[in-house]
Amino acid sequence: MATTRVYLHTLGCPKNRVDSEVMLGTLTGAGYRLERDPAQADVIVVNTCGFIESAKEESVDAIVELAGMKQEGRCKKLVVTGCLVQRHAEELSAELPEVDHFLGTGAYAEIARVVSDAQAKRLVVPDPDFVHSAATPRVNSLPSHTAYLKISEGCDNACAFCIIPKLRGAQRSRPVDDVVAEAAALAAQGTVELSLVAQDLTAYGYDLPGKVRLHHLLPELCKVDGIRWLRLHYAYPRDVPDALVEVIAREPKIVKYLDMPLQHSSDRLLRSMKRGRDSVFLRELLARLRARVPGIALRTSLIVGLPGETEEDFEDLVRFVEEQRFERLGVFEFSPEDGTPAADMAEQVPDVVKRARRDRIMALQQEISREHQRAMVGRRLEVLVEGRAEETEHLLAGRHAQQAPEIDGITYVNDGVAYPGELVTVEITDASEYDLVGHVVARDPERARRPLPAPAGGETPRRGGLPVVG
């Protein structure tokens, strides 16, 4: 009997990617085979995002496009999961008759049963209380040397613009030993870089017994053999104690990079957003991080066009960006989401104004980024090699410690030999606004002694540069 083939399409954030990987693990554990081509899949799963309007539109477009595989391919069953389902299950069910099943964020563990059971309900949307554990099957969908590690699920904040608590439920932190066990399992599969994610990373542990917090978890993760880089994403600024800053500064495995969504700098807007901290607190926190963790790269995200955002508020934000000179920065245009207080606030900002404000901040950040990048020229950086560059086979592509996967720039290597997943020392010779260029100047001696090419069945080493010689 032929094995049923499954294709899974993921939209949204890294946390959604982890959910997809858990579903893939559940499906492969039940005997299904993963398929990269949707036209060849018997079952198609779409894991959606429902955070803002543009994400919802992208999710619906993907569902409609992949539904065509029922006529054009071999697909017999289409399943839609994730945040959009948790939020709009009844509406989606009525508008998308071609979808066989809808699973909410609390039903990921049910995916194999729903796919296999001809009598399964069409809508499976329990309360959003699922959280995976180290024992939960999971298939890493990134190259084996890097992975996301979700340390908690849900969020207890009440930001006026955000729908996430309704989609993901209350915060549920995973026990320290469970998180460490999953990290060790990933390391055993060849992972050297772990990116920690959560809806609110710095709130980790307050719901666990024993007053466990993030600064208790991190040293335990640093003890995991094989893990070389740990990076922190989605660090809510409200709760960054000195103990956490000290751990970041002290532990060499924790890369000097922190992703911290600040959203705005105007005190009036921070109050209306219910962010819980004012601009004085934010500035003091950023100064403390810069002083205690020399060389740290700070990434943030901002929202422009919030209800009531005046020109004065926006100019305050421009000055804040100019003053703080973040190494990495992204900007979202405010999206009014039904069910959030901000959606019903007066003084909604026109879309054309939002777009202009976003463009102005990003143009400013491009100049700041160019300044940071140029300062890298001449430095020697540890770079994690990913493989051949997408643009040309004559370059290797990698990332240094302050370039996160999927969201930041790339370090291109134009001369030298390295294996995918290898950490090498690269001297930077050129820079653009977001990317760097350099050549390998040092490798781990054990790696460097391995022959080129590798023995049959082993890794294939990669050479950057033109011409390619071997």
Swiss-Prot record:
Top-rank taxon: Bacteria
EC code: 2.8.4.4
Annotated SUPFAM superfamilies: Radical SAM enzymes
Annotated TRAM domain residues: 374-442
GO terms under biological process: tRNA modification
Occurrences of domain MTTase N-terminal (ranges): 4-120
Domain Radical SAM core: 141-371
Cofactor note: Binds 2 [4Fe-4S] clusters. One cluster is coordinated with 3 cysteines and an exchangeable S-adenosyl-L-methionine.
Main location: cytoplasm
GO cellular component: cytosol
Reactions catalysed: L-aspartate(89)-[ribosomal protein uS12]-hydrogen + (sulfur carrier)-SH + AH2 + 2 S-adenosyl-L-methionine = 3-methylsulfanyl-L-aspartate(89)-[ribosomal protein uS12]-hydrogen + (sulfur carrier)-H + 5'-deoxyadenosine + L-methionine + A + S-adenosyl-L-homocysteine + 2 H(+)
Cofactor: [4Fe-4S] cluster
Subcellular location per the Swiss-Prot or TrEMBL entry: Cytoplasm
Family of this protein: Belongs to the methylthiotransferase family. RimO subfamily.
UniProt function note: Catalyzes the methylthiolation of an aspartic acid residue of ribosomal protein uS12.
PANTHER family reported for this sequence: RIBOSOMAL PROTEIN S12 METHYLTHIOTRANSFERASE RIMO, RIBOSOMAL PROTEIN US12 METHYLTHIOTRANSFERASE RIMO
Annotated protein name in UniProt: Ribosomal protein uS12 methylthiotransferase RimO
